[in-house]
Structures are given as C-alpha cells and as structure tokens.
C-alpha cells in the first residue's frame, strides 16, 4: 500500500508502473493519491506502508530512500511582456500574480522557500488543486505558477501557450523520496521498490 502525492503521481507512475509489472509480476502495489499532509498522516496511522513524496516536508520519524532531485520551473504565458530570461530570478516573480497549490501540498512550500521572499506567502494565491489546473489558469493569462521539472518533461505544457524556465535559486529543487515507518519489517521491500523507482 503506497501513497503518492499528486505532483509526482501523473508524471512518474506512467513510466514506472508498466516496467514494474513486467519485471516484478509478484509485487502487488495498491496505490492511493493524497496530498503530502494526508499521505504522511496515512503512514503514521498505518493506512499505507510507504509514501512517495517530495522533501523537505515534515514527516516525523521515518526511514527514507532518495529517488531523485527535481528542479522547479517558473511557468508563464508565452507572450508575457516581461520576457523572462533563460533562468528566472525570484526577484522577477510578481507575487500578486503567483498561483500556487492550496495548503496541504508540499510543492507550495517548496516554491515559496525557493523564492526566499517572505511577503509572497501573504500575496500569492493558493487556489489550485492540481498542476493541470494551474497550467490552464496560466494559459488563460490569470497569472504565473511554479512547476516541477518532471511535470514539464512529461508534457504538462503540451497544447498550451505556456512556457517554463528554470528558477534561478539555490533552493529551486525538491528531493523525491520514498519513506516508510521506522523499524518496518518490510524495509528490504521498500529499498527494492526505491531501486525500481530510481531506474524510472
């Protein structure tokens, strides 16, 4: 039983699951998609055995296996008058136009931390329940947003007039990790699963 957060599930699982079924037909994986907050709570209460999420995030006492690093990109309308450079500095982000996922999603916190501008927390609009929704809002010129590189690589911008550029910040990355309860007797299974996830 594994929880996966929504800013990872649609971009990593389609590549990973077919290969896992082929190579490990004996492994029965029951998946559920939850926000980071709910997924960690499910792990703590024994509703799931492991969680695929993005760090940093408060997880309590857990063991973890590193999967990958994932950069953050700034997404904006193609005809944005500011014509953002190849690497977008946080100072160029208009916090009044910044659209983020609502509370409970760790990507919101990662985006705010990467910008290192405390005033953004009050000004940014926490509205989206999915990255696809945020992209559609940007495509309709309602603001700009932050996207993980894995979403951009998976084609989330296809069919839109939205472009994405890397955020120029030392904190503009998140760690994709598999976590499980400390002292779990299934540690070897989780490490094997992490190895399969790293192979992507």
Which ranges hold each PLM region?
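Central regulatory/effector-binding core of bacterial HTH transcription factors
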Residues: 1-60, 128
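A late-sequence structural motif
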Residues: 12, 162-200
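Flexible hinge/capping segments at coil-to-helix
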Residues: 59-98
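Short beta-strand->loop
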Residues: 63-73, 149, 158-172
């Amino acid at each position: 039983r594994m929880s996966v957060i929504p800013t990872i599930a649609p971009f990593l699982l389609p590549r990973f699951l077919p290969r896992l079924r082929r190579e490990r037909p004996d492994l029965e994986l029951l998946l559920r998609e939850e926000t980071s907050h709910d997924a960690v709570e499910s792990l703590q209460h024994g509703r799931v055995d492991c969680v695929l999420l993005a760090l940093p995030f408060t997880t309590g006492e857990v063991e973890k296996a590193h999967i990958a690093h994932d950069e953050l990109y700034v997404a904006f309308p193609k005809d944005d008058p500011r014509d953002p450079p190849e690497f977008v500095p946080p100072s160029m982000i208009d916090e009044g136009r910044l659209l983020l996922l609502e509370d409970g999603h760790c990507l919101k916190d990662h985006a705010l931390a990467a910008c290192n501008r405390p005033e953004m927390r009050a000004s940014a609009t926490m509205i989206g329940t999915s990255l696809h929704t945020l992209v559609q809002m940007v495509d309709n010129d309602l603001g700009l947003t932050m996207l993980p590189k894995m979403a951009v690589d998976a084609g989330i911008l296809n069919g839109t007039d939205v472009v994405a550029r890397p955020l120029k910040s030392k904190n503009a990355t998140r760690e994709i990790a598999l976590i499980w309860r400390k002292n779990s007797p299934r540690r070897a299974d989780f490490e094997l699963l992490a190895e399969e996830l790293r192979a992507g």
